[in-house]
Amino acid sequence: MSHTEPKAPVNTGEVENGHLYDGSGTEDDPFIVEFQKDDPGNPMNWGQSRKWFIAAIATLSVFAVTFTSSAYSVSANEVFKDFDISTEVFIVGLSLFVLGFAIGPAVWANIGLRSELYGRQILWIITHIAMVAFLGGSAGSQNVATLLILRFFAGTFGGSPLVNSGGTIADLFPPAQRGLALTIYCVAPFLGPILGPIVGGFVSESVGWRWVQGVCVIFIGVVGILGIVFIPETYGPVLLQRRTHQLAKADGKIYVSVLEKNQGKKLPSEVFKRALFRPWIFLFLEPIVLIASVYMAIIYGTVYMFMGAMPIVYNEDRGWSVGIGGLAFLGIAVGIIFGLVYAIWDNNVRYMKLFAAKSANPESRLPPAIVGGVALPIGMFAFAWTNYPSIHWSVSIILSAPFGFGCVLVILPIMNYLIDTYTIYAASVLAAAAIFRSVVGAVFPLFTTQMYHNLGIHWASSIPAFLTLLCMPFPLIMYRYGEAVRMKCKYSFEAAEMMRKMQLQQTAAATTTEKDKDSSSE
């Protein structure tokens, strides 16, 4: 049986009278609330300009946080003067910030601040305010302990955009459009750490390390305000849940969301437990997530390894100043930009043709990763063995570009692949990948200085190159056998079945609506 929403004086902002829901409105047969065709309450049906503006702010937040994590890394000489500490202690400030990216989501899950229960908007507000507060405090630190602790807490809250922003983009764009949006979004966690030292180096050299933190406070604060003003709630299950409450309040009948019907009603304690443990379940019990996360973590760790490696290669060995030394990251930055251009071209030319022909599957995302998997070790080995002081500095910087190029072409397709594979579990999968890569990103800088001094700049730079060489077959293997693997993994299979059911229900609802329109016209 179908039901037309009552014309109650409820200003919901999303609910529109005339939508048809299956059910009878009773305890045994509640109305099933779901997004209808062209439903204005569905974020995927919002205007393109609005969606892209929201996506741009979410992406800028990720860039700001990762920029902040690395801008600190070139302030060593200034911090040494104020606190009389060793290089190892200084590097801890970088590692603790990145470690916060991993710990943050688990902490919020434990205290109940999870997007799956309350939505993404509240997380944005709380975490950006907290980041500004802790970074502002770190700028005024009077001892190194305060500096390290406050940077850790800033990073803990900074982990929110890394996970939450990706979920926001998945909320806004269907698979046909999501590739381009995620292409731009996924560049931010890698371009931010690369550009941070360039800006931070000149700021530190000119006005001191405290203003490096100050610039980051201003940056994150402005982005946070933009998000508070312009980004509404986008998480579909929360929007549907709110709609069920509004409809029930309007006419007193029983409504449940389609996701609640399919998965069952969850108590807050169950949601918290799931949010705390599910990323780890995905990470260790889903082979696709584990292998993909390891690959991305190696790349991410290498990016942060460069925070300690570049000053050794160019500042110590070549005598460059702090500001000029930051420019050594330009080669990787240019490679990232070229990778972004290639990824956009591939999405528009190759993937969209497959999608239009209805022959695209998650594995269709992976061909660029095969190219990127080859570019990564080439760039890293080239950088490692051309950074002799006797070879002109421009050679090693130019040859580091393939590493940046490969970063984009490996990370972007894998992220899209995980989202397309796990759909309704995408937030938890992205959280698992983010947690793991953040832990690795925090660990790599801790041994970078000793590794470069003990092994030398050539062999030390070659170690992560060998690791990426080991991972190189993964995209090719998954491209060839991924579909069979997905069907054997519990959660990827469950996600596929859930999406199939939801699509069938939406098709049936659309058919019913068309029949009702035809009947009324007669």
Swiss-Prot record:
GO molecular function: transmembrane transporter activity
Principal location: membrane
Alphabetized UniProt keyword annotations: Membrane, Transmembrane, Transmembrane helix, Transport
Gene3D superfamilies named among the record's database cross-references: MFS general substrate transporter like domains
Region (Disordered): 1-21
Disruption phenotype: The production of sorbicillinoids shifts mostly towards tetrahydrobisvertinolon.
A Pfam family of this chain: MFS_1
Location in the cell: Membrane
Topology versus the membrane: Multi-pass membrane protein
Cysteine pairings via disulfide bonds: none
Transmembrane segments: 52-72, 89-109, 121-141, 143-163, 183-203, 211-231, 280-300, 324-344, 366-386, 395-415, 427-447, 457-477
One cellular component term from this protein's GO annotations in UniProt: plasma membrane
PROSITE patterns (UniProt xref): MFS (PS50850)
Keyword Transmembrane helix: yes
PANTHER family: MAJOR FACILITATOR SUPERFAMILY (PTHR23502), MULTIDRUG TRANSPORTER, PUTATIVE (AFU_ORTHOLOGUE AFUA_3G01890)-RELATED (PTHR23502:SF158)
Family under the similarity heading: Belongs to the major facilitator superfamily. Sugar transporter (TC 2.A.1.1) family.
Function comment: Major facilitator-type transporter; part of the gene cluster that mediates the biosynthesis of sorbicillinoids, a diverse group of yellow secondary metabolites that restrict growth of competing pathogenic fungi but not of bacteria.
UniProt-recorded name of the protein: Major facilitator-type transporter sorT
Organism: Penicillium rubens (strain ATCC 28089 / DSM 1075 / NRRL 1951 / Wisconsin 54-1255)
